[in-house]
């Protein structure tokens, strides 16, 4: 099994989500090292925003950053409206993906994304704690 994955693609629908990764085995977790979004059509769109969401995406909001929600683990924006393009990329350093990962497009247009995942080994206790946190339960 690989120790890292690079996932990249496009979400064509505005305010939509896409499952981009499913963890293949028990006692294996995945950590996001890098996440960035940018407009799918750089000529027509000057702004885009996205976030990474682990586990069930049904609770994900497409309109805000959800920094309070433990399933939201990374946020990225891109704006080309100024002379120099600017972006903000934030990754929660205390997260482990144990089931699945979704990218959420919070923009009114299509967005491109790239994510780098690194594999980590989990003992049984760590896996249970990660699953509880992923399901938004108190730990």
What spans do the regions from the language model cover?
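Beta-strand-centric surfaces of beta-sandwich/beta-rich domains
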Residues: 1-31, 36-139
